């Protein structure tokens, strides 16, 4: 039996913030000879994405409970029980040595199923505030890790696994020193875009004129509207794209990023070594604010809560950052990153499997 490869089941779903870090760890361990399967849901992004990475995926039926009506909440215990039973059957067949919970609804019943079978449960929390599922699973987990300090009182801070092409970018000093011309502003609202960025940045561009050049990811279906907004502001020269497929190339081009502060975005910007102006999504637990705070504290970023994200405030901030200031901020961002996060998570998975 000692010659058999170790088996890992990754539990992650719903959003890229959960799925992409899980894929990074999965590939790292597969390169070491591990056999990996995935536990997800059939109606979320992992259903299409994970098989494209050469990983087999099993599905359970589960969805979130937040914002659901009374009827759905009353049915929740039965739904969770059924999902637990499905996950347990899948694990009894695959027999993983360890499971890795990266977040999403699937982690709850999946983690419980593993625990009930005596399989070690390793958790990774990507956000600065722990999600409901991970808070609950932390009580039964073998190992708990966090990307940012503060999500759990005693968990190791290991960072977020990020894409290798971002990690491979030249360091800020190499990349940014000697740059001249307009400040290059990369605007990223996530794949769905961010209306506040789409509405505000064209007006900011009008105030800043030829001191900046902007590359703006508008999000799905918004490209034409945003292009018209720039043209209407007398700034048609700026580049607007619906999606940016090669984010590493975009980071390499940029001097500064204006964006939301999802966990993966913050970690990628730190790893790339870029200054940022963060506009956290307004959520009741302020998750994105807490994600961005370590970089603001490090002097690598500025946070604008959405009500403060005005044309004048943004234009004033961007115009106040010289190239020297931006280089200093970029170096601070890189210094605050944890570039070996993938290895750290993978090492904890290996340790739990051997225990």
Swiss-Prot record:
Record's bilayer topology term? Peripheral membrane protein
Task: Give compartment(s).
Answer: Cell inner membrane
The residues listed in the UniProt record as binding UDP-N-acetyl-alpha-D-glucosamine, with positions renumbered to this chain, are 15-17, 127, 163, 191, 244, 263-268, 288
Please provide, in alphabetical order, the Gene Ontology terms of the cellular component aspect for this entry.
plasma membrane
Q: Which UniProt keywords apply?
A: Cell cycle, Cell division, Cell inner membrane, Cell membrane, Cell shape, Cell wall biogenesis/degradation, Glycosyltransferase, Membrane, Peptidoglycan synthesis, Transferase
Pathway assignment: Cell wall biogenesis; peptidoglycan biosynthesis
UniProt-listed Enzyme Commission number(s): 2.4.1.227
Entry-linked Gene3D superfamilies: Glycogen Phosphorylase B (3.40.50.2000)
Q: What NCBIfam families would the database entry show? A: murG
Q: Which protein, by its recorded name, is this?
A: UDP-N-acetylglucosamine--N-acetylmuramyl-(pentapeptide) pyrophosphoryl-undecaprenol N-acetylglucosamine transferase
Q: What organism is the protein native to?
A: Citrobacter koseri (strain ATCC BAA-895 / CDC 4225-83 / SGSC4696)
Gene from which the chain derives = murG
């Amino acid at each position: 039996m000692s010659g058999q490869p170790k088996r890992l089941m990754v539990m992650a779903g719903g959003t890229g913030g959960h799925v992409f870090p899980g894929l990074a760890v999965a590939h790292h361990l597969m390169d070491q000879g591990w056999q990996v399967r995935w536990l997800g849901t059939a109606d979320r992004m992992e259903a299409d994405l994970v098989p494209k990475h050469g990983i087999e995926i099993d599905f359970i039926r589960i969805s979130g409970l937040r914002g659901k009506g009374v009827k759905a909440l009353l049915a929740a215990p039965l739904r969770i029980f059924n999902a637990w039973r499905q996950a347990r059957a899948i694990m009894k067949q695959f027999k993983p040595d360890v499971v890795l919970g990266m977040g999403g609804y699937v982690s709850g019943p999946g983690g419980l199923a593993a625990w009930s079978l005596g399989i070690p449960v390793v958790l990774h929390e990507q956000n600065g505030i722990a999600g409901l599922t991970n808070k609950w699973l932390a009580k039964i987990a073998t190992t708990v890790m966090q990307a940012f300090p503060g999500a759990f009182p005693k968990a190791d801070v290991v960072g977020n696994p990020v894409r290798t092409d971002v990690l491979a970018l030249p360091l800020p000093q190499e990349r940014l020193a000697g740059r001249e011309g307009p400040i290059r502003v990369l605007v990223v609202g996530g794949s769905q875009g961010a209306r506040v960025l789409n509405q505000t940045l064209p007006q900011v561009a009008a105030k800043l004129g030829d001191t900046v050049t902007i590359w703006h990811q508008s999000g799905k279906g918004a490209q034409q509207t945003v292009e018209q907004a720039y043209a209407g502001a007398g700034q048609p020269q700026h580049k607007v794209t619906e999606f940016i497929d090669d984010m590493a190339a975009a980071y390499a081009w940029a001097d500064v990023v204006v964006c939301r502060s999802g966990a993966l975005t913050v970690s990628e910007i730190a790893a790339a070594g870029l200054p940022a102006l963060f506009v956290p999504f307004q959520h009741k637990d302020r998750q994105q604010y807490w994600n961005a705070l370590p970089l603001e504290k490090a002097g690598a970023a500025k946070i604008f809560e959405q009500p403060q994200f005005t044309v004048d405030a943004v234009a004033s901030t961007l115009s106040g950052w010289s190239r020297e200031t931006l280089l200093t901020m970029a170096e601070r961002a890189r210094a605050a990153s944890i570039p070996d996060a993938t290895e750290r998570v993978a090492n904890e998975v290996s340790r739990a499997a051997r225990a």
